[in-house]
């Protein structure tokens, strides 16, 4: 099964809504429409930028999509600071990132909570980008494949095969996020293949063949081609490089198979 590459730009806690508009305009200007036939491109801004991004995308009829950096496991109620999937759906979001390593590290999010958030996202018509990844000590001990397979099981616990088919999985080794250190293409392929194999166990071979598995961790225009060229890597969750409109457009074009815009 041919899987269309996905390039997702996670802006993290950067850019106000004015800056968000400028960046989306830059990406749209730098990446001609023809590339979107061969690659899906999405931006993941802070919550406060989403309405502005929605207005621009809808008004200019851009093929770029957008999503949220997190979603509550709750639908509504007395949950101060939480953002419901229903709210995000109203804002036109396509994706919701769940279980990013920074959420797991700084907010103590567990696989169980990530599974609940993924379920909530799906309930509201959002595609969850379910993030897993190991710390450096796990990698150095040689336990990275086992760790990620176990984390995948926990982060998809309770989801049906049909629901799993609607997810995106992002492998983001924690030691490579924002550090400049990048897993080799072979490292990325090793874990992404193990993820796909486990998806086959959790759902079916057909589901596993259709789910997109991304790599995240210091991805840029120089390394994205080799990484996305691996058989089980279907795109990238991009951090810092997604804040540069030209570079993000360039790496999206590379993921589409070129030529450069």
UniProtKB/Swiss-Prot annotation:
Q: Which reaction equation describes what this protein catalyses?
A: D-glyceraldehyde 3-phosphate = dihydroxyacetone phosphate
Source taxon at top rank: Bacteria
Q: Which InterPro entries match?
A: Aldolase_TIM (IPR013785), TIM_sf (IPR035990), TrioseP_Isoase_bac/euk (IPR022896), Triosephosphate_isomerase (IPR000652), Triosephosphate_isomerase_AS (IPR020861)
Active-site residues from the entry: 100, 172
A Pfam family per the record: TIM
Please give the Gene Ontology molecular function terms for this protein: triose-phosphate isomerase activity
What is the annotated localization of this protein?
Cytoplasm
Give Gene Ontology CC terms.
Answer: cytosol
* Membership in a protein family: Belongs to the triosephosphate isomerase family.
General function of this protein: Involved in the gluconeogenesis. Catalyzes stereospecifically the conversion of dihydroxyacetone phosphate (DHAP) to D-glyceraldehyde-3-phosphate (G3P).
Q: Quote the subunit structure annotation.
A: Homodimer.
- Tell me what this protein is called: Triosephosphate isomerase
Per the UniProt record, the source organism is Mycolicibacterium gilvum (strain PYR-GCK) (Mycobacterium gilvum (strain PYR-GCK))
Species lineage, top-down? Answer: Bacteria, Bacillati, Actinomycetota, Actinomycetes, Mycobacteriales
UniProt lists the gene as: tpiA
């Amino acid at each position: 099964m041919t899987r269309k590459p996905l390039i997702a730009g996670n802006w993290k806690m950067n850019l106000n809504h004015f800056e968000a508009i400028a960046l989306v305009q830059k990406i749209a200007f730098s990446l001609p429409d023809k590339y979107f036939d061969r690659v899906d491109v999405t931006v993941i801004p802070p919550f406060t930028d989403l309405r502005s991004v929605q207005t621009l995308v809808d008004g200019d009829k851009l093929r770029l999509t957008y999503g949220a950096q997190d979603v509550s496991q709750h639908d509504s109620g007395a949950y101060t600071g939480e953002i419901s999937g229903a709210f995000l759906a109203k804002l036109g979001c396509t994706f919701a990132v769940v279980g990013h390593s920074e959420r797991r590290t700084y907010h103590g999010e567990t696989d169980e909570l990530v599974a609940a958030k993924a379920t909530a996202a799906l309930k509201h018509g959002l595609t969850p980008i379910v993030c897993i990844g190991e710390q450096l000590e796990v990698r150095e001990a040689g336990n990275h494949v086992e760790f990620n397979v176990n984390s995948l099981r926990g982060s998809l616990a309770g989801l049906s095969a049909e629901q799993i088919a609607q997810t995106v999985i992002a492998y983001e080794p924690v030691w490579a996020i924002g550090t400049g250190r990048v897993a080799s293409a072979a490292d990325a392929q090793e874990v992404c293949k193990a993820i796909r194999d486990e998806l086959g166990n959790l759902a079916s071979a057909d589901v596993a063949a259709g789910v997109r598995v991304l790599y995240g961790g210091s991805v840029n225009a120089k390394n994205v081609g080799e990484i996305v060229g691996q058989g089980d890597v279907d795109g990238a969750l991009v951090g810092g490089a997604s804040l540069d409109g030209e570079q993000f457009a360039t790496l999206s074009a590379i993921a589409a198979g070129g030529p450069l815009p």
